[in-house]
């Protein structure tokens, strides 16, 4: 699978998670402490969510009631998260 396709799929998942949580982009951006434009870029795949700072990712996950693995696309990071969750 092409990595750009994988990143786009995960970013689309971010949008689906946000909508399932009943949050607008501006609401989620405020909860995560980021600009609406940044969230829009994550959702479109124009900005890689893997480049976000951990506190920002945790705020996004907290607001969406999801795990980091639900929004992270980097395979190495996902493997580390899986190992951490196993312990």
Regions found by a protein language model. Name each.
Residues 34-50:
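Recognition helix of helix-turn-helix/homeodomain-like DNA-binding domains
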Residues 54-70:
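DNA major-groove recognition helix of helix-turn-helix/homeodomain DNA-binding modules
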Residues 24, 35-38, 53, 67:
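Short coil turns linking two alpha-helices in DNA-binding domains
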Residues 14, 28-29, 39-42, 71:
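Conserved hydrophobic/aromatic packing and binding residues within compact polymer-binding modules
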Residues 19, 30, 62:
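Alpha-helical residues within the helix-turn-helix
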Residues 2-4, 72-87:
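Short, charged recognition helix plus adjacent turn
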Residues 1-20:
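A short, Lys/Arg-rich alpha-helix, primarily the initiator
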